[in-house]
């Protein structure tokens, strides 16, 4: 199926002018982007001069770029967890919760590879995010991304969302449901998605999406919010899913964003001819009827053993048992296990050992797995945190005038660019 034919089939709600704009925007190539820890915005711009920060308000730390030959993933700052690469329209979604002043318990039901979790966690360091993924391999990749970003407020779990037990009903203040979909919003980025697209896939996905959204409604706290999103333009996976699951306990909330979007009956679509991204549908729901659960009165999980090994979020101690946790928090430093403690930054608790600052060229060598030679001789052999611009890159051991590399070989980045 050709791209034009696909949009004619899928986007029947668009007029001819809108379909033409959508086709033209895809033929020019998708915008790429990333989310940056706010204090590093200027530093990232210095290292990646081809990026722009075109957004404002809640998305002021999201950048865009268009050049297809650029490789921002091969930069020292990316290795150090300063930014995470993702579609800007994907970054839009987790920024649409209504503002409140409480410490929120958040569930990302289908979190891998982690873009929405990371975007949210950076902006809300006091909240606790349960980032769940049904696939073990994808959950492990999710955990690696969370570790690289050094986020202390994220717990990674591996569960079928439908199997989250009833003990968790009505306790999550905010839920992200980026549901598995047929992927028509990714035709530009992933041409194979166009080759594999069928209407049968749309129908199969819509059935799963309805089940997941019904589960999300059960898990959502009274007055809590759900952001339902897909990267599909099919109405059957978007508004029709919302309509099929609406009941008296749920109300639709308008997304009051400063950005232009395509308004639908129940949500918004971020078409690439309107928004600098690849495409996303999002709908915002609020639970207005249901049981009010006091999380402080729940029978809590036993985290005593975990607490001795990890710095964990206080809310974890109040959650019921039943989560299949892969990564419960930030590992506490142990000099017998230095290779497991790779990243540390503003959002991670750094062990109280010496830092050694190196140049960008030295940082590239270190990340590739090499030793780093220093201009100073050190009389004491000791473990140190190797930093660039005060951004921790990993651990090393000083011996005389060099730093022996303690990065695990599996983390070497041989293609890192000067």
Briefly describe each language-model feature range.
Residues 1-48, 276-281, 288-418:
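Polybasic, low-complexity RNA-engagement segments
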Residues 102-112:
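Conserved class I S-adenosyl-L-methionine
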Residues 113-125:
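Conserved SAM-binding loop of SAM-dependent methyltransferases across substrates and taxa
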Residues 137, 174-214, 231-238, 257-258:
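Mobile active-site "lid"/loop adjacent to the S-adenosyl-L-methionine
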Residues 172, 225-228, 232-310:
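Class I S-adenosyl-L-methionine
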